[in-house]
């Protein structure tokens, strides 16, 4: 009897790991598609450029971007606040490091699941939907990035919290 319970318990534990792995795969397919970047409407531009002043600046620096603040703090870009507009430029070090991409802007990596924390069980309806709580971190961070300069960027030094709904399809779990 003890052996049966032990085998059944091990099977349940392994089933949970598989589900966790499936959730991680589905979330990574969604959040890992694009790089984590500071971008403009038209990235194919020459520097320095004038930027409109943000109406609300969540950073308090005038940039309204913690990613841009990291590039400025590391000395790869320059940012000057003006009366009616701001000016953004790239330093010689930034040019050498190729910090600006004409397709994506200035990127610091891409997001990937760090840990699946918990999930809801699918309901009894026609569609199986779960809410997954997880943490993510930045991966594929360029080697020339000083992580201290980018300490305010979520996921750079510490995992960031997030949640996502996943739907069970005939091809496995998918993010909506």
Regions found by a protein language model. Name each.
Residues 25-46:
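Post-signal peptide N-terminal segment of mature Sec-exported envelope proteins
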Residues 53-74, 107-111, 136, 158-159:
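Short amphipathic alpha-helical interaction segments
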Residues 68, 74-113, 119:
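Accessory beta->alpha helical hairpin/"wing" motif in late/C-terminal subdomains of nucleic-acid enzymes
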């Amino acid at each position: 009897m003890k052996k049966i319970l032990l085998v059944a318990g091990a099977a349940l534990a392994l089933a949970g790991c598989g589900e966790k792995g499936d959730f991680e795969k589905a979330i990574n397919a969604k959040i890992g598609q694009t790089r984590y970047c500071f971008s403009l409407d038209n990235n194919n531009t020459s520097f320095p450029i004038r930027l409109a002043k943000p109406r609300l600046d969540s950073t308090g620096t005038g940039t309204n971007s913690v990613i841009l603040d990291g590039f400025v703090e590391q000395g790869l870009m320059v940012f000057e606040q003006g009366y009616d507009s701001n000016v953004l430029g790239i330093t010689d070090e930034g040019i050498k490091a190729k910090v600006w991409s004409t397709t994506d802007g200035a990127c610091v990596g891409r997001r990937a699941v760090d840990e699946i924390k918990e999930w809801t069980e699918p309901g009894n309806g026609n569609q199986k939907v779960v809410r997954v709580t997880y943490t993510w971190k930045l991966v594929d961070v360029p080697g020339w990035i000083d992580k201290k300069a980018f300490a305010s960027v979520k996921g750079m030094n510490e995992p960031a919290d997030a949640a996502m709904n996943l739907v069970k399809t005939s091809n496995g779990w998918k993010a909506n």
